[in-house]
Amino acid sequence: MEFPGLGSLGTSEPLPQFVDPALVSSTPESGVFFPSGPEGLDAAASSTAPSTATAAAAALAYYRDAEAYRHSPVFQVYPLLNCMEGIPGGSPYAGWAYGKTGLYPASTVCPTREDSPPQAVEDLDGKGSTSFLETLKTERLSPDLLTLGPALPSSLPVPNSAYGGPDFSSTFFSPTGSPLNSAAYSSPKLRGTLPLPPCEARECVNCGATATPLWRRDRTGHYLCNACGLYHKMNGQNRPLIRPKKRLIVSKRAGTQCTNCQTTTTTLWRRNASGDPVCNACGLYYKLHQVNRPLTMRKDGIQTRNRKASGKGKKKRGSSLGGTGAAEGPAGGFMVVAGGSGSGNCGEVASGLTLGPPGTAHLYQGLGPVVLSGPVSHLMPFPGPLLGSPTGSFPTGPMPPTTSTTVVAPLSS
């Protein structure tokens, strides 16, 4: 089985991008040092030569510092070896170092590494082989406890730019990774949260206002509030700072008294013929009657005009025109009242003239009368929706001599 960039995994040929052929030989001794299973560590401790331990340490350091991972800040050795575990003939290192499950996820970043060439172990006489194997056992349980290179001080940022990752060592980020309050490096999302410099303090040169919906300028360029600016634009002068006092109510003039009735409250002050102040009631009375209003008509309260039209007044006016509107006749029907304006026969009932059936007189009580002047002989009975056909006819005998006759009859709708 072959993968791009990895070569053939089914053979015993070492990976060219991860293992240096000069450090790991293809002799059977490599199988002795890299057996599969946890017991391989103890076996390697008893049968490993110092030179083999030195070569294994250099190989492990080279695994960590391979140039193939210089383009990513993530050390991908562990996931790759975990994938190679189930492949026949794959790397035996994945089997004994990590077991069935990987301890390093693919997104884990080593923050304490630096980009440096692999360092060889200085112990060449084999005295440190036991401590090195103990270190391998410790790494098997927790790989992040093994540090082959010197750790960086905490005050310096991690140089991730060597691996091709994002560079956070700029002035926008502090060494600990917290963002700084710098408006030059703020993103559009952070601009609303960062403290902004206060706006320029503006003040109206006319009234001294500091808050207005719209700032305006006068001819000289000074700031004006919206009210002062509009006033200056419309009137050509500055808006007065003191509002003019409202017009005093005439009825509450101090010291003013009616010359006629000596009242001090009125809706309107007037003057009489001599120029003295009088109240509204006395002034109107004198204007209409040319005499002073009598003191007996004086009231404590001010009488107002009732401007609402009442229906009772209209009924009284309608019933007073031309005598009575309709009268009950001898047979129970209502009659037409005829009378002369100058002969004094107003109120006489013309006998024999009935315009409606008995009991219908109440239908015409609210109707206004129609006044007709002249002789009655030309009036002819007419049918209507409420009146019906006349039951009698006009008298054929001679009519009493009248100069003018007034006939009052209800309207027919």
Swiss-Prot record:
Changing R307C: In CNSHA9; altered transcriptional activity at canonical GATA1 target genes, affecting both silencing and activation of select genes necessary for effective terminal red cell production; may affect binding to specific genomic loci; partial loss of nuclear localization. Residues 249-315 are annotated as: Interaction with CALCOCO1. Residues 305-318 have a biased composition (Basic residues). Changing R216Q: In XLTT; does not affect ZFPM1 binding; reduced affinity to palindromic GATA sites; supports erythroid maturation less efficiently than wild-type GATA1. Highly phosphorylated on serine residues. Phosphorylation on Ser-310 is enhanced on erythroid differentiation. Phosphorylation on Ser-142 promotes sumoylation on Lys-137. Changing D218Y: In XDAT; stronger loss of affinity than of G-218-GATA1 for ZFPM1 and disturbed GATA1 self-association. Erythrocytes. Residues 200-330 are annotated as: Interaction with MED1 and CCAR1. Gene3D superfamilies: Erythroid Transcription Factor GATA-1, subunit A (3.30.50.10). It comes from the Eukaryota. Residues 297-327 are annotated as: Disordered. It is linked to X-linked dyserythropoietic anemia and thrombocytopenia: Disorder characterized by erythrocytes with abnormal size and shape, and paucity of platelets in peripheral blood. The bone marrow contains abundant and abnormally small megakaryocytes. Thrombocytopenia with beta-thalassemia, X-linked: An unusual form of thrombocytopenia associated with beta-thalassemia. Patients have splenomegaly and petechiae, moderate thrombocytopenia, prolonged bleeding time due to platelet dysfunction, reticulocytosis and unbalanced (hemo)globin chain synthesis resembling that of beta-thalassemia minor. Keywords: Acetylation, Activator, Disease variant, DNA-binding, Hereditary hemolytic anemia, Isopeptide bond, Metal-binding, Nucleus, Phosphoprotein, Repeat, Repressor, Transcription, Transcription regulation, Ubl conjugation, Zinc, Zinc-finger. PANTHER family: ERYTHROID TRANSCRIPTION FACTOR, TRANSCRIPTION FACTOR GATA FAMILY MEMBER. This is Erythroid transcription factor. There is a cross-link at K137 (Glycyl lysine isopeptide (Lys-Gly) (interchain with G-Cter in SUMO)). Changing R307H: In CNSHA9; altered transcriptional activity at canonical GATA1 target genes, affecting both silencing and activation of select genes necessary for effective terminal red cell production; partial loss of nuclear localization. One of its GO terms (cellular component) is transcription repressor complex. May form homodimers or heterodimers with other isoforms. Interacts (via the N-terminal zinc finger) with ZFPM1. Interacts with GFI1B. Interacts with PIAS4; the interaction enhances sumoylation and represses the transactivational activity in a sumoylation-independent manner. Interacts with LMCD1. Interacts with BRD3. Interacts with CREBBP; the interaction stimulates acetylation and transcriptional activity in vivo. Interacts with EP300. Interacts with MED1, CCAR1 and CALCOCO1. Interacts with CEBPE. The modification N6-acetyllysine is found at K233, K245, K246, K252, K308, K312, K314, K315. Coiled coil: none annotated. Residues 203-222 are annotated as: Required for interaction with ZFPM1. It comes from Homo sapiens (Human). The modification Phosphoserine is found at S26, S72, S116, S131, S142, S178, S187, S310. A zinc finger (GATA-type) spans 204-228, 258-282. Changing S142D: Increased sumoylation in vitro. One of its GO terms (molecular function) is transcription coactivator binding.
